[in-house]
Swiss-Prot record:
Name of the protein described by the UniProt record: mRNA cleavage and polyadenylation factor CLP1
Organism (species): Mycosarcoma maydis (Corn smut fungus)
Gene of this entry: CLP1
Protein localization: Nucleus
Cysteines engaged in disulfide bonds, as pairs: none
Subunit structure: Component of a pre-mRNA cleavage factor complex. Interacts directly with PCF11.
Family to which the UniProt record says this protein belongs: Belongs to the Clp1 family. Clp1 subfamily.
A GO-annotated cellular component: nucleus
One MF term in the entry's GO annotations: polynucleotide 5'-hydroxyl-kinase activity
Region spans: Disordered: 142-166, 562-582
Length: 629
């Protein structure tokens, strides 16, 4: 590597000049370990190295960082460094061209940092705003969660904007959406921005003034809604959490929310989901990149594990909703409906979590294709409106940048400004600033075979936990030595002992969205109307339908929060069928895999990550299949 790699192929040292990048791409069964070597740079400074913005710790805390599962990443250094690399990679090199990390991407981070500081100042200066925000989720005009589609028109709300009453631009951190074609580096940029936010020297607090006193008077009840002056009603667990929060008041770093709108990513928790992941600088101020199976780090929802892994970057489980498709374009109407519910959950969090509010949103999106231009990028417009996006970043796509500028034309702003956006029913939404950034030269084109392997790995990891190098990693039948850092599972995900359980057909309520295929309306008999739409929920009947039994076998089911509290042992969750919106807006509690169907005994055998009672008997099926081989 340009004469700057030393040592054997198993252990070698790589010298990184200032503002350089060491890139590697792993193939199946390849593993790599990297550590930052102690010492000084040629200019006498302390060395530094980071991966997607996550700092590699050196000095007295020197440690090895493992990588596997076909990971593709880059080690960047601002001041220069020497790293030691163990293992082999099919592709590894020092980038010759300058990386945008040191110019455009870091400038974008500084732009977002200014907006976060402005939001913090606004919250500190307006104590009354905190009370208004906290009480907004209790406003009778605000649509109750999971009973009515947030954008549904009602008699009392003909404009369909009641769900947006909780939104206020004041004290709101940046809401940035990353756009670009497939394999443009969108997720990598999202991780870099999130890691830089977590590592920021800023303190995401309300300070010691009147605003802090008002926030102190707000308490969280057992139902997750904020009530004023509820100290006496706090459980012991909530009081303990409060004391821990007080200790964290001076912790540096922002608390952003990462939203994943790409259902093919599978992170978190699995493919076919849309998720909002609240981050915090504790326990670790970074999102690990050990495996592409955990694009945003590890958490209980990602792995099915009860305790978080040792390398968990965050202790808060994501809000995940089930889309049921890996490609949003297969049912874009349903995608928009799920996006509305996810955005509503984010707004509710921002109304009660002031750290997250001032830290803002970072939104990852699916790759834009040519066909999206035919309907004027309708899904992008809907997401911008739903999440009140104020900054759109376009990666490496000149035409898309021009199209976004036309759709959301507005001057760049650095203060809170609002404007009516077409189709917003008169809502005052933030002006949108469109920014074009270059694509990194290290971006790797991913084929469908790789994506299929990654999806299978994500599902397997959910049920079985992480994997180690172990003796299965052999060379000519001789086990290879375990690399540093690979004695534990990648990402700190613990190994699990999945458990099979048998459930009667009539006990598990399973729904799907629409039919697999719909005949055109013109093919229907004269005067007849369609009974099932592409957004309507259909309850499966495996007892009487052989087709439903076939569709269930080998499928992965999303277990959702029972809409009406759930039934007791041996009882279904619902005495009457819930509404579509009660199912669509319900958060995912976990997943089960349908391993077997017994048509004679009318029972279904499902695999869960661990033994114990299932968290729900209400499930949704989609296109996610997996065979446990």
């Amino acid at each position: 590597m340009d004469g700057q790699a030393e040592g054997s192929s198993q252990y070698r040292r790589v010298h990184l000049p200032p503002r350089s990048e060491y890139r590697f791409e792993l193939e199946p069964h390849e593993r790599l370990s990297i550590r930052l070597v102690q010492g000084r740079t040629q200019s006498g400074e302390d060395p530094d190295a980071e991966i997607f913005g996550a700092e590699l710790v050196g000095g007295s805390q020197e440690r090895w960082y493992p990588f596997g599962d076909e990971a593709k990443a880059a080690v960047s250094s601002w001041r220069g460094a020497e790293i030691e690399v163990a293992g082999s990679a099919s592709t590894e090199y020092l980038a010759e061209e300058p990386s945008p990390v040191y110019t455009a991407y870091s400038n974008l981070h500084l732009y977002l940092e200014r907006k976060r500081i402005q939001a913090r100042q606004a919250l500190r200066a307006d104590a009354k705003l905190l009370t208004t925000l906290a009480s907004s989720v209790l406003d009778p005009s605000y649509i109750a969660p999971r009973t009515t589609d947030p954008n549904t028109e009602t008699e009392s709300d003909p404009s369909g904007t009641a769900a947006a009453t909780v939104y206020r631009p004041e004290g709101q951190g940046p809401r940035v959406m990353i756009l670009g074609p497939e394999s443009a580096g969108k997720t990598s940029l999202v991780k870099l921005l999130a890691n830089y936010a977590l590592r920021s020297p800023a303190v995401a607090s309300l300070g010691k003034g009147e605003a802090a006193k008002v926030a102190e008077s707000l308490r969280t009840g057992g139902d997750g809604i904020i009530y004023p002056n509820m100290e006496d009603n706090l459980s012991e667990e909530a009081k303990k959490q409060k004391r821990e929060e007080e200790k964290r008041s001076d912790i540096t770093g922002w608390w952003p929310v990462v939203v994943n709108l790409d259902p093919s990513d599978g992170a978190p928790p699995l493919p076919c989901c849309l998720s909002a992941l609240p981050l915090s600088p504790l326990p670790l101020a970074s999102l690990p990149s050990a495996s592409p199976a955990y694009a945003f780090g590890t958490n209980t929802s990602t792995t099915g594990a009860i305790p978080p892994g040792t390398s968990t970057a965050h202790g808060v489980a994501p809000l995940s909703l089930w889309l049921g498709k890996e490609n949003l374009r297969e049912n874009e109407r349903h995608f928009r409906r799920v996006v509305d519910w996810l955005a509503e959950g984010v707004e509710r969090r921002f109304a009660r979590d002031f750290r997250s509010r001032m830290s803002g949103l970072i939104i990852d999106t699916p790759g834009v294709i040519t066909a999206d231009a035919r309907n004027k990028y309708a899904f992008i417009q809907h997401c911008v409106k739903a999440f009140k996006v104020d900054t759109i970043v376009v990666l490496g796509h000149e035409k898309l940048n021009l199209e976004m500028t036309k759709l959301f034309a507005s001057p760049a702003v650095t203060t809170v400004e609002t404007a009516e956006i077409p189709g917003s029913a008169g809502q005052r939404l933030p002006r949108v600033n469109v920014i074009k950034l270059p694509k990194s030269g290290g971006v790797v084109e991913l084929d469908e075979t790789y994506r299929s392997r990654l999806k299978a790995l994500q599902v397997k990891t959910y049920f079985y936990g992480g994997s180690t190098s172990g003796s299965a990693n052999t060379d000519g039948g001789v086990p290879k030595p375990v690399l540093p850092g690979h004695s534990d599972p990648l990402g700190g995900v613990p190994s699990l002992s999945p458990y099979s359980t048998t459930i009667p057909f009539d006990l598990l309520e399973i729904y799907k969205v629409g039919q697999e295929s719909l005949a055109p309306s013109s093919a229907l008999p004269i005067g007849a109307s369609r009974t099932v739409t592409e957004t309507q929920l259909v309850k499966l009947d495996p007892t009487n339908s052989a087709a439903d039994q076939t569709s269930l076998l080998h499928s992965v089911l999303a277990l959702i929060q029972p809409p009406r509290g759930g039934g007791g042992a041996g009882q279904p969750d619902s005495s009457t069928n819930p509404t579509d919106d009660e199912i669509i807006g319900a958060p995912i509690l976990g997943f089960v895999h349908v391993a077997d169907i017994d048509t004679v005994r009318k029972k279904i055998t499902v695999l869960s990550p661990s033994a114990g009672r299932l968290p729900s008997k209400t499930a949704i099926i989609g296109s996610l299949d997996w065979q446990d081989v």
